[in-house]
Curated annotation (Swiss-Prot):
The keyword Cytoplasm is annotated on this UniProt entry: yes
GO annotation, biological process: formation of cytoplasmic translation initiation complex
Primary localization: cytoplasm
Subcellular location: Cytoplasm
Name this polypeptide is given: Eukaryotic translation initiation factor 3 subunit I
Ranges of the WD repeats in the UniProt entry: 8-47, 50-89, 145-184, 188-227, 285-326
Organism: Drosophila erecta (Fruit fly)
GO cellular component: eukaryotic 43S preinitiation complex; eukaryotic 48S preinitiation complex; eukaryotic translation initiation factor 3 complex, eIF3m
Length: 326
């Protein structure tokens, strides 16, 4: 089946995310304007206009009422999903690299970059009664990162912990009540982590790393369960909600991309079996590295956002579901 090509960004995509029902697909890019799309037919429903810099991250809450974005203009913004208005704008001292709502939607976490003389910090805010006064309020928790900066983040079960992936390949779990690290993965990855995504039940998560591998980890112990090997840096990885499949996307850094790379299959979405660690399919499409991947919550399609500024939504054929691994 032909993929839907969503063209609404002028610069490279930084992150894409479905809401819980899967009817909305959110995308953000370096062109300052996050978009929301109707995932079934690729219609653009709206644009969230307000940032003055590249938008690095976004997340939508459980009820699809609020959207949080973090950008290079040194702000985190919380938006009304339906009306596209800014509920709150929180100033920071450096670029915001990650932002996530907790599962309950009561809290949000975001992290800042190690830049401009500022160290990387992890912040927690209460967003239950979010309004414009949030910009003056102190965060409920603030954890400075003494070692490597945070490049990706997930909420742990029951909103009690936060899992962070770092620029040196380290993964850590933080207890948000005590404000301290409780588990450290050590050196499973030898280079920076670009992306982390949970499985549907939250017991596992997959990482995508610059060390050319993606790995499956246990969410509580941070034990490395599986490794998916490729030949080039992995920018994003996602776990299928219905099949034992993992999809990986990446390519070289944007600086190193040459015109021959598309033919060489360097920008394909690559499908691996979750348990057997074997690659079984590739899908072409992007004219540059894939920066973000997301499975639809029903598992029947997936979306990819690339350095070329396109978001592609690919629906699986029936043969995909009949393919039993032997």
């Amino acid at each position: 089946m032909r993929p839907l090509m969503l063209q609404g960004h002028e610069r490279s995509i930084t992150q894409i995310k479905y809401n819980r029902e899967g009817d909305l697909l959110f995308s953000c890019s370096k062109d300052q304007k996050p978009n929301v799309w109707y995932s079934l037919n690729g219609e653009r429903l709206g644009t969230y206009d307000g940032h003055q810099g590249a938008v690095w991250c976004l997340d939508v809450d459980w009820e699809s009422r609020k959207l949080i974005t973090g950008a290079g203009d040194m702000t985190t913004k919380i938006w009304d999903v339906e009306y596209g208005t800014v509920i709150a704008s929180i100033p920071t001292k450096s670029s915001v690299r990650t932002s996530n709502f907790s599962f309950s939607g009561n809290q949000a976490a975001y992290s800042t970059d190690k830049a401009m003389g500022q160290s990387c910090e992890l912040f927690l805010i209460d967003v239950r009664n979010a309004d414009s006064s949030l910009s003056e309020q102190e965060p409920t928790l603030r954890i400075p990162m003494t070692e490597s900066k945070i490049t990706s983040m997930l909420w742990g079960p029951l909103d009690e912990t936060i899992i962070t992936g770092h620029d040196n390949g380290n993964i850590a779990i933080w207890d948000i009540r005590k404000g301290q690290k409780v588990v450290d993965s050590g050196t499973d990855h030898s280079a920076g982590i670009n992306d982390m995504q949970l499985s549907k039940d939250g017991t596992m998560f997959v990482t995508a790393s610059k060390d050319t591998t993606a790995k499956l980890f246990d969410s509580e112990s941070l034990m490395c369960l599986k490794t998916y090997k490729t030949e080039r840096p992995v920018n994003s990885a996602a776990i299928s909600p219905i099949m034992d499949h993992v999809v990986l996307g990446g390519g070289q850094d944007a600086m190193e991309v040459t015109t021959t790379s598309t033919k060489a299959g360097k920008f394909d979405s690559r499908f691996f079996h979750l348990i057997y660690e074997e690659e079984f399919a590739r899908l072409k499409g992007h004219f540059g590295p894939i920066n973000s991947l997301a499975f639809h919550p029903d598992g029947k399609s997936y979306a990819s956002g690339g350095e070329d500024g396109f978001v592609r939504v690919q629906t699986f054929d029936s043969t995909y579901f009949e393919n039993i691994f032997e």
